[in-house]
Amino acid sequence: MKVVFMIDGWFMRKRIYKLKTFFYDGPNIRRYCLKHLRGGDTLYRIFYYDTAPLDKKGHNPISRNAINFAKTIVAEEQYKLLESIKRTPNFALRLGTTAWKNNRWILNANKFKELLEKKINVDDLVDSDVVPWIEQKAVDMKMGLDIASIATKRLADKLIIISGDADIVPALKLARQEGMIVGLDPVRNPIAPELSEHVDFIATRT
């Protein structure tokens, strides 16, 4: 069977960082995917969906210090990751867009709780207690279109999704209707019922 993988990059990166399973780069992601292959399986392609770092400037609301988000350590790590994926065999990189939602910031949940409980006040907050409200756009759409194209053109026999997003359910239903075997790798994350309902098997290789 020809096997195609589709990876929600933001989701997988977050899970691997939490589990500390392996150094997160193109070659190691490829090795992880290959663990899913069984006798008679061949790798068709690994589609990786993500966004480039936010390319904007702003001011931290706590200190008012200027920030160039494209030059932060997090951004530099993301650029390195994307370059690594581009250089790794069998990968197809699909990039959506990164948006800063209304230039808003999100307060750390623990700090928010401490504020409500009056254990701290606003003057106790530091720059690292807030992060910009970042949204990924067009990632789910690109994944859905690729699933539909591969399924209808019979380019692969088995699809393995590494994601936790139930928004791709319509595309998974189409793939199964077209005769593909559909698997889900949640990377040990809880699975939404509507997602597990529309796959043939669930397996994690961590």
Per-range role (PLM):
Residues L95-T206:
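Nuclease catalytic cores that cleave nucleic-acid phosphodiester bonds
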Residues M1-L115, D127-S128, P132, I181:
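Domain-level signal for Mg2+-assisted phosphodiester chemistry and nucleotide/NA-binding surfaces
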